[in-house]
């Protein structure tokens, strides 16, 4: 799947032992078939290694199992950033406002 040109995005969860996979990753082949990589927790070691060895930007965030109860706001953010590539700097989440400005 990592080297399949038809696959555009890979989500994977965290997991103890992710760091043990690093010596077995073929970074050259990943660079030849770039895609979006998204994970969290222990998967960060793999995300950082992919970036460090390929200059491909990786993403820390949602994994598929967390999409069951995703809010509309989070769904819009995810789609605009990673699917459509049309993200704006800021999408308002609610009509809340600060009573007193913070630091």
Give the role of each language-model region.
Residues 1, 48, 75-79:
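Short, Φ-rich (hydrophobic/aromatic) sequence segments
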Residues 1-33:
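N-terminal small/polar loop signature for handling phosphorylated ligands or for N-terminal nucleophile
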Residues 12-13, 37-40, 100:
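Short glycine/serine/threonine-biased micro-segments
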Residues 16, 41, 45, 73:
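Conserved active-site and cofactor/substrate-binding residues in soluble primary-metabolism enzymes
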Residues 19-22, 47-49, 70:
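Short glycine-/acidic-enriched loop or helix-start segments at secondary-structure transitions
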Residues 24-27, 52-54, 74:
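Short, glycine/charged-enriched secondary-structure capping and boundary segments
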Residues 27-49, 57-64:
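Short, acidic/small-residue loops that bind anionic groups at enzyme active sites
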Residues 55-103:
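Conserved anion/nucleotide-ligand pocket segment
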């Amino acid at each position: 799947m990592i080297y399949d040109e038809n696959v555009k995005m890979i989500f994977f969860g965290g997991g103890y032992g992710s760091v043990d996979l690093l010596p077995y990753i073929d970074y050259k082949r990943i660079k030849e078939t770039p895609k979006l990589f998204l994970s969290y927790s222990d998967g960060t070691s793999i995300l950082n290694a992919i970036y460090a060895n390929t200059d491909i930007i990786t993403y820390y965030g949602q994994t598929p199992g967390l999409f069951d109860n995703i809010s509309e706001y989070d769904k819009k953010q995810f789609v605009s950033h990673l699917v459509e590539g049309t993200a704006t700097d800021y999408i308002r989440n609610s009509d809340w406002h600060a009573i007193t400005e913070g630091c």
